[in-house]
Amino acid sequence: MDKCKHVGRLRLAQDHSILNPQKWHCVDCNTTESVWACLSCSHVACGRYIEEHALRHFQDSKHPLALEVNELYVFCYLCDDYVLNDNTTGDLKLLRSTLSAIKSQNYDCTTRSGRTLRSMVSADDSFISHEGAQAFLQNEDRAFTALWHRRHALLGKVFRSWFALTPKGKQRLEEERLREEAEHKREEARKRRQQLKHKLKEEMESTPPRKSSRLQQQIQPSPKIESSSVQKMNQKNAPSTKQNPPAPTSDKARLKKIGNSPIKRKPTVTPGVTGLRNLGNTCYMNSILQILSHLHVFRECFLQLDLNQTQELLAADGSGKTRLSSKYPPGAELPRVTQKHTKGQRSLARRPSFSLGLSGGASNSRNMELIQPKEPSSKHISLCHELHTLFQVMWSGKWALVSPFAMLHSVWRLIPAFHGYAQQDAQEFLCELLDKVQQELETTGTRYPALIPTSQRKLIRQVLNVVNNIFHGQLLSQVTCLVCDHKSNTIEPFWDLSLEFPERYHFSGKATASQRPCLLTEMLAKFTETEALEGKIYACDQCNKAQKQLMVCRLPQVLRLHLKRFRWSGRNHREKIGVHVRFDQMLNMEPYCCRESTAALRADCFIYDLSSVVMHHGKGFGSGHYTAFCYNPEGGFWVHCNDSKLHSCAVEEVCKAQAYILFYTQRVTQENGHLSERLPLHDSPQSPPP
């Protein structure tokens, strides 16, 4: 619509919530796909093709104008059309330019004369300058987790009261009463044995020693006080061991004791079930971080390794030359991460103590800073250090929500392509993140090795081995001459398999693409099918006709399958193939492997179990929302990770998801035939049952 009369009445507030990237998601369903911000109030919700929360807001409030956060379109509900005009003050134009600057984190502007005016605050510094906003969100994380604990405590109290009235609860109370009586009898028997032991010891000490013992005491006089006198003094001061039997415990107290038992009680928050706040179109990062944290071996590596201490050691001065403290000479082992330095040095205790924190009490600010600091303490930003810190919080079983400010800051600094609040691709982010982590480990391990303790160098090599090999596999590219049957083999490494959809899903224009579900096994078969080489691509002496085939010759421990859902449509447009891909919990890779290379493997080595799924919600490449399904081995259930909102789900719901990236974990490794023991650190990764 060229002219919308409702725009002229618009009065936009300068502190509108749309200027805060953390608000760029639906307040009801948490999606970042097709998000519309009301221009009359601070409400942000999804469009009518998602859950219609923005439309419902208009029906309740009668606020007509809304702006799409990512595409910057303005829509009028009263006119039922898009708005092209602006008000007299040009608020819409100013709002669009402001949002574009926030999204790209580029605050430069050009005057009419062509001069570029740069903001006094750089893009990186602008992230750090909003300490008030970060502190506010951290307090919200604290309050959210405290509320989580409070709700579960009340639910537990109500459940225990109800359980005490049921036949099963009464039986449980009777069993606990009998167990207490048996424990009391064992305690009494133990005390009687203790008294008898003390009595025999006193009698032995009161008897005169033998001659040989007296001579030995004269030769080597003992400066210690006689133990018998000390024991008699202690017995006089100590309370009598003969105590009355404890009063019988009431059923209510006994049931409460059962619920509060440290042996049986599980953490209120299951380790790993911690939400990540969306800081502004960061769902791509949150979904990948959830996936990596649920890969057991990957997580255990970074829980042990903290490169922050090593990098501070190497970067003690700007020239790269550093001297170790006299307390830690070269070759000595530095203190562990959980220890603290001497006075005047920064604390390295990364694991916060939650003694009074979020179990209904207030945690001090120092513990909050140890979770995700607002700014890395060292000039050398470390992705490994941020992974170490974030995984500690997510798997502590204490926090229900955390804001990954420091992780986002490190990504902005080290991976400039993801700088800003624009929507990004999760697959590209995963590849870039792993590449940067690998480079950081290689650089840290080889730079000034004499300054790094031997134990730390060994740990860095082990973690680097995990990062390099956990997704690493090998492909056999085999070209066969159709005339002389000569075969040319080439080994190529891979870290994921990008699978294309069959041709029936690639029609465009007048032809209609098929909407029948596609099978994952069909896409794998297409990846390994024989392909004819046309033209003078292949030269075999006098022959030229050949065919090529890709086969897997070395299986990775974690198999990443990237479904190529986005295709080019026209010159500059990429559209999405939205067909459902059927995949199972178990995947047999034997049909797609080279028989000659894998002939010595056991049959179980080809079996993979589904461990994680990344989903893309939306219709286009440049827009949409990412969520993830992760199998949590601590709780033995699947979790749907939608930024800050997490909930358990059934595996049937997982298999119905519109998958974008699939993660399968090898059930038995090919080196030794044991369950997932390829990598050297800690326990073997726990895979979901088939």
Curated annotation (Swiss-Prot):
InterPro entries: Papain-like_cys_pep_sf (IPR038765), Peptidase_C19_UCH (IPR001394), Ub_carboxyl-term_hydrolase (IPR050185), USP_CS (IPR018200), USP_dom (IPR028889), Znf_RING/FYVE/PHD (IPR013083), Znf_UBP (IPR001607). Residues 274-667 form the USP domain. SUPFAM superfamilies: Cysteine proteinases, RING/U-box. One of its GO terms (cellular component) is cytoplasm. Zn(2+) 2 binds at C26, C29, C46, H53. Zn(2+) 3 binds at C38, C41, H57, H63. GO terms for biological process: cell division; negative regulation of ubiquitin protein ligase activity; protein deubiquitination; proteolysis; regulation of cell cycle process. It is an enzyme of class 3 (hydrolase). Residues 173-272, 319-366 are annotated as: Disordered. Gene3D superfamilies: Cysteine proteinases, Zinc/RING finger domain, C3HC4 (zinc finger). It is found in: Nucleus. Its EC number is 3.4.19.12. Belongs to the peptidase C19 family. USP44 subfamily. This is Ubiquitin carboxyl-terminal hydrolase 44-B. It comes from Xenopus laevis (African clawed frog). The gene is usp44-b.
